[in-house]
Design a protein with these regions (language model features):
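Conserved glycine-rich Rossmann-like NAD(P)H-binding loop of the short-chain dehydrogenase/reductase
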Residues: 40-56
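The beta1-alpha1 cofactor-binding region of Rossmann-like NAD(H)/NADP(H)-dependent oxidoreductases
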Residues: 51-52, 73-88
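C-terminal substrate-recognition "lid" of short-chain dehydrogenase/reductases
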Residues: 94, 256-285
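Catalytic loop of short-chain dehydrogenase/reductase
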Residues: 106, 112-143, 151, 158-215, ...
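Short, small/polar-rich loop/turn modules that mediate ligand/substrate recognition or access, typified
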Residues: 214-219, 278-280
Length: 289
């Protein structure tokens, strides 16, 4: 019989001592996930191509504890970097890892987004020109960054996640894939078709991996965020690797856009004992979009 003590929030959502890896963990939603895990006491390895971001985040957010942040420089689009990432994690965490958050991603359709309001949707030529606007290269690069890279990072880290599933008794390792509400909604996403399609595919890949990996006691779930401040949505970040969105909260019941606590709470739920019986699911953290 479960005791009342086992149902306290400190027990259910505790990640103290957990080992987590967050790709793209140096800014935006990845940093929000990192903050939540560090606040819960986890050891977090953030992965980025930008060493200056890794060093800055590790220094600033480790000081706030109780967990720790470590940076590993890697481009997850590069198979050699994925291999080096895995080997470094194996050397530093021989008992394995508990949580993998696949978050790194790109959108390369800013120009189409900027012209979405000027498209004549009653003109075949206008629509065709808009749809063809960025060409095949943008599609291929977007799919490579937002889908293919995550598949191969996950595959390479399965042995470490397998080991990690036995670290915490009665628990299992957790993969949390950060997709986007753009992969679900029917709107045009302001013309970011490659981005939206890559995220829809990533959400479905998450379900397939959940079915594939359950014999190893590795869970796979997906978070689809809505409008959050990030370098992708605002174009930049401040000295704390944070971004801001002004005046867009009126359409949400919360009266604001997404914040750190919204991502952190979903990550802690899926990564902790609280989410042990949750697998193959998608959580929409979108304010009701």
């Amino acid at each position: 019989m479960t005791s009342t003590q086992d149902l306290t929030q400190n027990r259910l959502f505790d990640v103290k001592g957990f080992i987590a890896v967050v790709t793209g963990g140096g800014s935006g939603i990845g940093l929000m996930a990192t903050q939540g895990l560090v606040a819960g006491g986890a050891r977090v390895y953030i992965v980025s191509r930008r060493k200056e971001v890794l060093d800055d985040v590790a220094k600033k957010y480790s000081q706030k504890g109780p967990g720790e942040v470590f940076g590993i420089k890697a481009d997850i689009n590069d198979p050699n970097d994925i291999e080096n990432l895995a080997k470094e994690l194996e050397a530093r965490e021989p008992k394995g890892i508990n949580i993998l958050i696949n978050n790194a991603g790109v959108t390369q359709e800013a120009e189409k987004k900027g012209h979405a309001s000027s498209v004549d949707y009653h003109s075949a030529d206008s629509v065709r020109s808009w749809l063809e606007g960025n060409g095949r290269d943008v599609w291929q690069q977007t799919l490579a960054s937002n889908l293919i890279s995550h598949h191969f990072v996950t595959a390479r880290l399965i042995p470490a996640l397998d080991k990690g599933s036995s670290i915490v008794p009665g628990h299992s390792s957790s993969i949390i894939n950060i997709s986007s509400i753009s992969g679900t909604v029917k709107s045009t996403s302001a013309g970011q078709y490659a981005y939206a399609a890559s995220k829809a595919a990533f959400t479905h890949l998450s379900r397939q991996l959940a079915h594939t990996l359950y014999p190893l006691r590795i869970r796979v779930n997906c978070i689809e965020p809505g409008l959050f401040p990030s370098e992708m949505t605002t174009g930049g970040s401040d000295e704390n690797q944070k971004s801001k969105i002004e005046g867009a909260g009126s359409k949400f019941p919360a009266g604001r856009t997404g914040q750190e606590a919204d991502i952190a709470s979903a990550v802690l739920y899926l990564g902790s004992r609280a989410g042990t019986f949750v697998n193959g699911e998608t959580i929409h953290v979108d304010g009701g979009m």
